[in-house]
Amino acid sequence: MGYTQILPTYVISEETPFYVVFGDHTRSFNIANTDFCVMDNVKILKPLQNYTLRELIFIISSWKNGIVDKGYSRHWSIAKEVKIQLPTKDGKIDFEFMDACIRELEEERIRELSAYLTVSGLDNYKLSSEEKEALDKFDSPLGEKLQNVQWGECRVGDLFEKLNLKFKKSTFNKATDISKTRTSEFNIPLINAKFGDNGIMYYGRKNDFETASMTIDIVNDGAISTASVYPQPQETGVLYNAYLIKPLFNVNNQILYFLSTTIQKSIKEKFGYENKAGWEKVKKESIQLPTKDGKIDFEFMELLISAVQKLVIKDVVLYADEKIQSTKKIVKES
């Protein structure tokens, strides 16, 4: 999704509170509730009656399940002929059931989200004084930044080593040895030439792949993914067209996030499909890191990322809290 200054082609109104946007190549469905324009490769669908948001979610979820995946081919000719299964009551579509079903799923997901935020420590979005101080150094005018933070230049190869993780079996079969869905069997994330989704497209069996944790993933090949960099704090394996590097010093998640972002900023514009981001090249590149008394300031890196995490997660925590309180209120009233 992008933005433009031109007048919207489709306008949300009381008569049409939602449009459904169908991705012709991807089979994806999105629901638009604000004015928008379109470019290409999408179909704009106007509901024939005023469905609620939950009813639309139910309908398009059922609809997508019936559309055969033809890869990058166009799908609308197939999608418009699909017959879908919907709940009925007394011979009519049971919209009340659909609404209740989606509402129940929402409440379940909110509870799971709340539990995850609590367990991971992300439910606390209040900044400590040290975190505020770290952010303040970046809130100052651009010309003062170098005065507030001391930076040093470091060679990537002096800070990291490349890991040579392998597939353990003698032969590899893509159809049976990996899965696009994470399951109890296929539970190890595998890096490859993936743009987005933290560089993960496939999962493998733990016993089939050599793995490492607290590493950084660098994509060395790919039309748009070359030189994409992703932190991989969890146990991870290597599939193809990417490699893992590991710091030569102990790090935690926050420091790993800082380092991966810094590397990406340094190399992303230098490499591409015609100039692969192999380790022999990348290790010679330099990155800028905060320093204190002539040494890398890991404490500042950790504080800054921790503060940014809290700022990013704040709205999610407040949203979850609001939904949980609303659910408790409904249960109490009923």
Regions found by a protein language model. Give the residues of each.
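Non-catalytic DNA-recognition/assembly elements of restriction-modification systems
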Residues: 1, 89-197, 293-334
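DNA target-recognition domains and sequence-specific DNA-contacting regions of bacterial/archaeal
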Residues: 1-83, 157-286
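A generic structural motif
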Residues: 48-51, 87-92, 248-251, 291-295
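An amphipathic, hydrophobic-aromatic interaction surface with interspersed Lys/Arg
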Residues: 81-86, 284-292, 304-305, 309
